[in-house]
Amino acid sequence: MAIRHVKRRYSESSESSSSDESVVDSTEISVDINDDDAVKPDNEESQLEGERDMATNDGMENNGCSDLSSDSEDSSSEESDEEPVFQRPIFIKRNQLAEVTDSNNQGNVLRRIEHENKVVEQNEEAKKQIATNYTTDKEILMKAMSLNDNDLIDPEGERLRWLERQKIRKEKYRKKLIDKQLELEEYEANKLLNRDIDKLEENTTTTTGEKDIPIKKSNRINNNKGDNEFKPKRVVNVTFKSLDDNETSAVANEDSEYSIL
């Protein structure tokens, strides 16, 4: 058994009589309540409160979803309607602007001066290199620069002068070949002469029967050191082949002592 004490306050009523002036401030009323009766209302109240909480949560979730959808729609519409954002301009005071322009002008002037100095130094170095390279060949360089290689002014005269130069070249080449041939013939003649002298010496030693007498070889011609390069031999089985057109042209183009004649 559970006992609850309930206190109640009674206010004075204007309708009460004067005889009932005594006021009861508080009265204690004892109520007997069974344990089962006390538990039931608590359970019912808790169930009601749980249902109310569920309903409020569902309402909040629905409201939140609707708010999110509306926010997303608003944000998409705002993004589509948004214009490109420009940076806010920065205004500089006149004094600061004048200082900045002065510093920029000074920096540009210094850069120009440095660039001009570098260009002057490079030109001087190039002149020095040219002077050192052509100090010994200045005359040749001047002659080469003064040559007139334009053939359009007098083509016939240029052709005649070219033919003259070609003729001089051929004569020089022919003279060179003749000198070489004469040198070879002289070598062969000296070799034959030395061979004859050796044979005469052998004959004199056999006929006398006496002791070998040394014979002066004053008549022998001293050969040069480069004579060993020439070793002529006798011709054996000489055959001449028929020359075709191609072979004749190749032989004609070949440089020899008779090619210029």
From Swiss-Prot:
GO terms for molecular function: RNA binding. One of its GO terms (biological process) is mRNA processing. Residues 1-88, 205-229 are annotated as: Disordered. GO terms for cellular component: spliceosomal complex. Disulfide bonds: none annotated. Keywords: mRNA processing, mRNA splicing, Nucleus, Ribonucleoprotein, RNA-binding, Spliceosome. Residues 13-32 have a biased composition (Low complexity). The keyword Ribonucleoprotein applies. Residues 70-84 have a biased composition (Acidic residues). It is found in: Nucleus. Residues 37-55 have a biased composition (Basic and acidic residues). Component of the spliceosome and rRNA processing machinery. In association with the spliceosomal U4/U6.U5 tri-snRNP particle, required for splicing of pre-mRNA. Belongs to the SPP381 family. Component of the 25S U4/U6.U5 tri-snRNP particle, a subcomplex of the spliceosome. This is Pre-mRNA-splicing factor SPP381. It comes from Vanderwaltozyma polyspora (strain ATCC 22028 / DSM 70294 / BCRC 21397 / CBS 2163 / NBRC 10782 / NRRL Y-8283 / UCD 57-17). The gene is SPP381.
